[in-house]
């Protein structure tokens, strides 16, 4: 009989004393509360400098899983780009310079696209502002902005403030015009809903879609129709004669300034894959010789990379594999990349002895319509694996508290927490029945703050601490831990030596 050591990541499950707007506190969760009271527990910092982000910056799923899997603080792309801008290296970046040189020589246009907000999860508008300033400095005349509106990592009706900030930089530099506006629901899909991506692509390339004289008018009209930032239909900004301000054409260059890959891959593939077949792009398929991605998005995206990956050697998965142990990664679609690619330090391939189980997320418009998502199917599949003695190490993600938490709606999020608690109980009992040990934690907060103090929906992540429980009574845990300390703690429990690259410290005293 194998005695599994399981890491259970309750995505978006933060801890906060105040109960107002707190779905985690208001939900009935007898299993979690029981384990918290019965077993050694502490809290971990999952935001800011503790996870390689700027101070005060909320954590997110990519950052959380990278830090947990690496067993160290992983300095995030946001921080890397900020430092490059501060130290003057950004303007010297070879990929940016190559794209600029190309459009200047050919007399073509430079298109900047990405998420327009200061959320810092997928992008930061300051990086786009740095690109506008660089284009102005280098004398690029035709610079067009394809803005993806956020409303998810920031407030649901904040787009106007970001458009205003962009207009200030356009005024300051003398370059840049808004060309298209799209809610991230369309432009940043990651779940193969290609019909959404197609609407965005057609606006950018063909000028198809609702038309407006300005970005402000687009947002105002959407709000008047009850459509907020995340869901704004891909729209085209037009000149006085109703022709598009710009479309993307042959020999233009693109700089896609999102730094987080998962929601950038699909739209990037449409522009970079010669054999793209997910939808018919039509007669006009622009040849973009210089398509620059801020970071490495995927092997499936044929673009240049401005900030190349940092190698993360000896992540938890690799160390476990080298020790000859069998490991399982399991999640539903929305969090599958996180327990695989991100948890393995940006590695797509499996390690020896690693098995993966993907359970499809339900096909619904938004997850508040189905707060349980596919958690029962994930749980059934995992309990079956545990009962069959197949794995020494298990990495599990329950997506609900994060994915439903993004709705900013209390009732569905409470249901999500309660479904998570029910399934947590089933998984932990199966592990304890095998004389195994579970480590229960989260990658960041979300469901712990669903309402602002004004009673408005709070759709973003939080900076609250996350739980850490070890279902083993003969250990004592220290305080002041961080996500990067979880892997060393698991290795301690497994009796596997911690490699020097893993600079986190075990939480077991």
From Swiss-Prot:
Gene3D superfamilies: Alkaline Phosphatase, subunit A, BPG-independent phosphoglycerate mutase, domain B
Top EC class, one word: isomerase
Catalytic residues, chain numbering: 61
CDD domains named among the record's database cross-references: iPGM
PANTHER family for the chain: 2,3-BISPHOSPHOGLYCERATE-INDEPENDENT PHOSPHOGLYCERATE MUTASE
Reported function: Essential for rapid growth and for sporulation. Catalyzes the interconversion of 2-phosphoglycerate and 3-phosphoglycerate.
Protein name as catalogued: 2,3-bisphosphoglycerate-independent phosphoglycerate mutase
Organism: Bacillus anthracis
